[in-house]
Amino acid sequence: MTLYHISIKKIIKHYTFSILVTSLLLSSAAFSGCSLKNATGTTDTKSQEPISATAIKLNTAVTVTIYDSQNRELLTECMNLCDKYEKIFSRTASDSELYKLNHRGLTPVSGTKDTFQVSDSLAELIKKGLSYSELSEGAFDIAIEPLTSLWDFTAENPQVPEDKLIQEALSKCDYRNVSVNDNNEVTLKTDDTAIELGAIAKGYIADRLKDYLVSQNVKSAIINLGGNVLCIGGKPDDSSFKIGIQKPFADRSETIAVMDIKDKSVVSSGVYERCFEQDGTLYHHLLNPKTGYPYDNGLIAVTIISDQSVDGDALSTTCFSLGLENGMKLAESLDDVQAFFVTSDYEIHYTKDFQKEITVTETD
């Protein structure tokens, strides 16, 4: 078995970004002797090598690997879809739909000053974000954009903001100031309300890529959006993909666990994804919308296995925000969701049925 690490490391002084989930895949030699069905449904004994494409999209490394087709146009369309959705969900691109909504650059609905018509995709994702904000009672808050912008973990030299500025930003963060109706009309109830979808957008986009590939008869593929891994089926021989979870703060080649995954999403959130150190203290990007500072609850990572990647994306952040006990309770209350939590002592805590449903090997 050959180990392929789908990873990127970007260091801008104190800022480190890393992809958490690596894929352990069989080498091409392991496919010899088997015939594969390509995306047109015909058998192709020569096309046994997977096809893959990687590009920097959505401010991260996007990799799509297809195992049962040689049609590279499928890969091109996946990258085009990433571009399409980035123009909808980006918080920072001035031509994106979300940016225009946050900066009141859209025309208000007739007779209103704070309600705006948005696209189906943006309305759908805002609704999803609001549902998790409500489920977590604000521990996950899609109206956290003023606080996210203030901390700006993507800056060349990120710094801890002044407390008075943090408190000012906090006063603007409340998901209850956002509503969306069935006509795709979004209401921002205060002038300072702004939406941040970074915690769920990649999951949503991964699901849309899967929808597209499945519509093209692809039955074996891995979609990796910066560590949001979504498996379509399993390997061409019908065995499971092996997905490795990176050990927090370790070398990119070091995993803490390896799981057998088929037709599921695997998403992780951790304190080491985007962080910087100041005066001997590590500050990470998972901000508490109640205090304005990074969460400090004894967790360093949460991994969610789910059917839909958007749910895994939202839940990995939500469960982290809730802490080990309450995050575990939430994960165990949901159908078709499994999770494991890594505490600061590197102990792994599984939801009750995790190891019954998913084969996992701890590697540390």
Task: Please state what every model-predicted region is.
Residues 2-19, 23-364:
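Mature catalytic core of soluble alpha/beta enzymes
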